[in-house]
Amino acid sequence: EYTSLSDFYVNCQKKFVCILDRIKGKIYRYTFDGQYIEEFDCDRSVFNNVIDIHYVGENKLLLNMNNHIGTLYNYALVNESSYKLEQFLHPYPVVSRERISNGMLPTVVYGNGNIFYTVLLSDTIYTIQDGESRPIYLYEGGLKHINYEALQQETPYQSIFEAEMKLIKKGYSGGLLQLFQLKDHLYLLNSSYKCNGIHINN
């Protein structure tokens, strides 16, 4: 069956585990006790650039993507029945020349029946509602929010981290780095490495 475990996700509603095999370009489904169910071909141009995969309900997958010259978007929304791309989300404000990911940081979390996620160089927290990406919270930490005009002042950049460091020196926020969900609170770590909490209302 699969030859490489590149990533996986769990669909708790339908009770199966899905494994991404980048070598074969396939998604394999298994029951919770390891029994093979079925397999699907996946679009290599999308799935070869995935950092991690999240089931977000309503038959949708949210894919967190690498930042490099072959990937122009932070996320992709994919149909779980076909594993076909529905739309790309959140264009990267800066595209790195080398492959960079934020996959080691928890940027997608679940809480109170919702999904919350961040994008690079942004203080906005997003959610998925009715199959669409929507902003839900804006973190105000006393620094200026990065915008298009600010980014253009120092172009070109070799990487997204170079852009972040230059803008932080000018009094801009570098965006949200990590999210954690604990009970009914959402905790976030900003680019100044300060942790703050948000109470989540249903």
What is the meaning of each model-derived region?
Residues N74-S133:
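Loop-centered beta-sheet repeat module
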Residues I128, H145, E149-N201:
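Flexible, glycine-rich surface segments
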Residues E1-Y2, F40-V46, Y83-M104, P135-K169:
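Surface-exposed loop and turn segments in beta-propeller and other repeat-based domains
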Residues K24-Y28, I69-L77, S122-T127, K194-N202:
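Structural motif
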Residues S6-Q13, I51-E58, I100-V119, K166-K183:
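Structural signature of eukaryotic scaffold interfaces centered on beta-propeller domains
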Residues V17, L61, I115, L186-Y187:
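Hydrophobic beta-strand positions that form the internal "hydrophobic ladder"
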Residues C12-Q13, I23, F32-D33, E80-S81, ...:
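Short, ordered coil/turn segments that flank beta-strands lining enzyme active or ligand-binding pockets
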Residues Y2-D7, L20-N74, K84-R97:
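Asp-box/WD-like beta-propeller blade repeats and closely related beta-sheet repeat scaffolds
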